């Protein structure tokens, strides 16, 4: 192979390998807590689904996020007794 062609091929491969990094592709989904404020409770009939995010490197708190029937999301206080009851009721409704 001609040295100029080899150099050109190496440069193209290097450019291709680093272009993914240059696009700004996210490394992780979210690296912070999603809930800035929490509610002590909400009526169960307004909840469509419930998501419990355990604490981890992204956030030191367990987060409970309820998706409401109107499409909005609400952050619930995982320490509140009413929220704990809601989580238990939602878990009982999930088939094993």
Curated annotation (Swiss-Prot):
Gene3D superfamilies reported in the protein's UniProt record: 2.40.50.40
Protein location: Secreted
GO terms, biological process: cellular response to interleukin-17; immune response; inflammatory response; positive regulation of hematopoietic stem cell proliferation; positive regulation of neutrophil mediated killing of fungus; positive regulation of superoxide anion generation
Post-translational modification: The N-terminal processed form KC(5-72) is produced by proteolytic cleavage after secretion from bone marrow stromal cells.
Domain of life: Eukaryota
Cysteines engaged in disulfide bonds, as pairs: 33-59, 35-75
Keywords for the protein's UniProt record, in alphabetical order: Cytokine, Disulfide bond, Growth factor, Inflammatory response, Secreted, Signal
MF term (GO), any: chemokine activity
Cellular component GO terms, alphabetical: extracellular space
Inducing factors: By platelet-derived growth factor. In lung, by lipopolysaccharide or inflammation.
Signal peptide residue numbers: 1-24
Function: Has chemotactic activity for neutrophils. Contributes to neutrophil activation during inflammation. Hematoregulatory chemokine, which, in vitro, suppresses hematopoietic progenitor cell proliferation. KC(5-72) shows a highly enhanced hematopoietic activity.
Family: Belongs to the intercrine alpha (chemokine CxC) family.
UniProt protein name: Growth-regulated alpha protein
Organism: Mus musculus (Mouse)
Gene name linked to the record: Cxcl1
């Amino acid at each position: 192979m001609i040295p100029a062609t080899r150099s050109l091929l190496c440069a193209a491969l290097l450019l291709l390998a680093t272009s993914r990094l240059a696009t700004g592709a996210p490394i992780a989904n979210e690296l912070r807590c999603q809930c800035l404020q929490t509610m002590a409770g909400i009526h169960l009939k307004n909840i469509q689904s419930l998501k419990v995010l355990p604490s981890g490197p992204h956030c030191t708190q367990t987060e409970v996020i309820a998706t409401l029937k109107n499409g909005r999301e609400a952050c619930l206080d995982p320490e509140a007794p009413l929220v704990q009851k809601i989580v238990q009721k939602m878990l009982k409704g999930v088939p094993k």
